[in-house]
């Protein structure tokens, strides 16, 4: 539901898959692929979230913000008050605007030399600027994840 700007990023870009029990059935793979289609985010009903992305930073960003959108929706619905939904034009415009805001690190590296090495490795997309900072925080907290 487009109840927040965060959720509007995903408007029309989320697939859904019905819960089929624990994923032991290999035949479910084909149904998951079919349900996902050309989208990169999926809500597995009564189960959880699934995302696909060309890089780990992009996948992390996608799952993080999809989860935030879901949390906001749960919070709003738990208020048991009438919903105020934006118009379709606003939802579509916001979704389109946010879809076009992906960061290209090559462009960022031209103004911030510290990003040059990361830019060459990462490419472009959401999450690429945040990812090095998240790894530095993890290195400080518990560097054993690299082993």
What are these regions (language model features)?
Residues 1-147:
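Glycine-rich flexible loops
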